[in-house]
Regions:
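Ligand/substrate-recognition segments at binding pockets and active sites
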Residues: 242-243, 326, 357-429, 443, ...
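Structural transition elements
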Residues: 195, 324-362, 378-381
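Surface-exposed binding/hinge segments that line
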Residues: 31, 130-176, 188-201, 502
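Periplasmic-binding protein-like
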Residues: 293, 297-337, 383-384, 481-489
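N-terminal lobe/hinge region of extracytoplasmic solute-binding protein
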Residues: 39-89, 120, 190
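Gly/Pro-rich hinge or "lid" segments in bacterial periplasmic/extracellular proteins
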Residues: 162-236, 244-245, 354, 358
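Long beta-strand-rich cores associated with HINT superfamily self-processing modules
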Residues: 497-524
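Extracytoplasmic/peripheral linker and loop segments enriched in polar/acidic and small residues
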Residues: 27, 349, 395, 400-410, ...
């Protein structure tokens, strides 16, 4: 979920808006040719798109592979290899009709048999296979039609099918049959996307080249969906884990693009001639979990005192480092999504220290430290924890902060609940609110919080097919979270990347640099 860290700055916002409109309207490339050298925060552990949560696998996989469906600029479901689909009246059978004339990178046509093999492989080998556990069967009706039957209706099925990573990538049946998880050879890294793999040298580069036989969708470009044109001939994704090297290489011209840049360079790079800065939003929402089952915060009044007393503006500025790189927002879902809601907002960022201090006393606080765990891997998370700790001290709490690498922090959060009172985390965008079921449902064991009412709401929302009715259910979930206080959201963090001005048409989206529908003004 966090491995990308390994959506007043009007010029930036206007750049994104104009580039999006320009790219969406393109029927052909304004210019063809050239090379992009992109400095990435890390190297992909694999290019077998279905098997890894790693952001680097997604960032490169979306160029190579496509699915039946994907997500658009509003993070809603959009067709990709499927031109359309229908649903049976009982909501248990989905029939997908494939686009005609689509070819894999090896020149073979895409058939329903390839789709069946790919979906079945995902169900057997992907770490996200539980998301599609509602599937009962997958079968080819004919060469261009696939039928997927569900064991029970699920409103989340198609959105989860569209989720971009690990994605349900469609690959040639002949290349994936019998291949074990983690054993896909480089010669089998074959998809239908606008770029194909030319060479992968681990920890050195991933070289993608334009796929001349690519068959783009006819709809306007939006998010990962629509008409994706490969105007650049070659893309080199270069792992540059040292952030100072990414910045220096971008400024010197060694790199055309650099991702995941530090906030302290934002103003300078924005003002640098020949460069453009882009803000990625939404990116992550920063949250802290409160231990509702063990320790002092089992007492609701103490949790309420913390919720009541926090100054979220101060915490988010400390986390992001620049006012352009965050926003305050109370919703469990991002503003860019249909599911955004202000339910419970009256309990967000109240910043009432006097009432909070009174509740600390009334809640029977015994003076022992509130134990806060955070991650030293991610500066924003660490900085947020320190700013929040300072505020707790002002409210009358003693505190103790312990910083770990991210995997260790999550292990303590999940398995050693007697060892913490507050644990930090961050969530990226979910294409469907059903993605939060695992985080919130009592029987998942993800966090200490357990609520029969929330469990019932989540179960109803997973099968409710009316969108407005689902929204109301998730609003009730959000309302319960604000009342029960198992976690507190600080705000939305934005990402910050930069590129050279010779690249035109670029529009930020999600956490992935999109170089389709982008062209080089000098063709080099």
């Amino acid at each position: 979920m966090l491995r990308r860290l390994t959506t007043l700055v009007l010029p930036v916002i206007m750049l994104a808006a104009s580039a999006t409109a320009e790219a969406a309207a393109m029927d052909k490339c304004p210019a063809q040719g050239g090379t992009v050298r992109a400095a990435m925060a890390g190297s992909p552990p694999t290019l077998d798109f279905i098997t890894s949560f790693a952001a680097q696998a997604r960032d490169m996989g979306v160029y190579i592979y496509e699915g039946l469906v994907t997500v658009d600029g509003n993070y809603d479901v959009a067709p990709q290899l499927a031109e359309r689909w229908t649903t049976s009246t009982d909501g248990k059978t989905y029939t997908f009709h494939l686009r005609k004339g689509v070819k894999f990178h090896d020149g073979s046509p895409v058939t329903a048999a390839d789709v069946v093999a790919s979906v079945e492989r995902f169900r057997g080998q992907s770490p996200r296979k539980a998301d599609l556990s509602m599937i009962a069967s997958v079968q080819a009706v004919d060469e261009a039609t696939v039928e997927i039957a569900l064991a029970q209706p699920s409103a989340a099925f198609v959105p989860l099918l569209a989720y971009p990573g690990p994605a349900v990538a469609i690959m040639p049946k002949k290349l994936i049959d019998g291949v074990a998880a983690g054993k896909l050879p480089q010669t089998a890294v074959v998809g239908t996307g606008p770029y194909r793999l030319a060479e992968w040298v681990p920890d050195k580069h991933v070289h993608l080249e334009r796929f001349a036989q690519y068959s783009p969708a006819s709809a306007e470009a939006s998010g990962y969906a629509g008409r994706r044109l490969a105007c650049i001939d070659h893309i080199y994704f270069l792992p540059v884990p040292e952030v100072s090297s990414r910045v220096a290489g971008l400024e010197s011209g060694d790199y055309d693009y650099a991702q995941n840049l530090p906030a302290e360079t934002y103003k300078r790079l924005t003002a640098t001639k020949g460069l453009k800065t882009v803000i990625l939003k939404p990116y992550y929402e920063i949250v802290m979990h409160l231990n509702t089952q063990q320790g002092q915060l089992k007492e609701w009044k103490l949790r309420r005192a913390i919720q009541l007393g926090l100054n979220e503006e101060e915490i988010m500025l400390a986390a992001a480092g620049d006012k352009a790189l965050y926003r305050l927002d109370p919703s469990l879902f991002f503003k860019e999504q249909y599911w955004h809601s202000t339910i419970g907002a009256n309990r967000y960022n109240e910043h009432d220290a006097a009432k909070a201090k009174a509740l600390v006393k009334d809640g029977g606080y015994d003076g022992s430290p509130i134990r806060i765990i955070t991650s030293s891997d991610f500066q924003f998370m660490y900085n947020a924890a320190l700013a929040m700790e300072s505020q707790l001290r002002q409210l009358g709490f003693a505190t103790k902060v312990q910083a770990y690498d991210y995997p260790t922090m999550i292990d303590i959060f999940r398995k050693k609940r007697a060892d913490w009172d507050i644990s930090y985390n961050a969530f990226s965008i979910r294409t469907d609110p059903g993605g939060f079921t695992f985080v919130l449902k009592s029987d998942s064991g993800y966090q200490p919080y357990a609520s029969k009412e929330v469990d019932t709401l989540l179960e109803k929302a997973l099968v409710e097919r009316d969108r407005k009715a689902r929204l109301k259910l998730y609003e009730q979930v959000q309302d319960n979270l604000y009342k029960d206080i198992p976690m507190i959201k600080h705000g939305d963090l934005f990402g910050f990347d930069a590129l050279r001005e010779r690249l035109d048409g670029f529009a930020p989206y999600y956490t992935t640099p999109r170089f389709w529908n982008v062209w080089s003004k000098d063709k080099r």
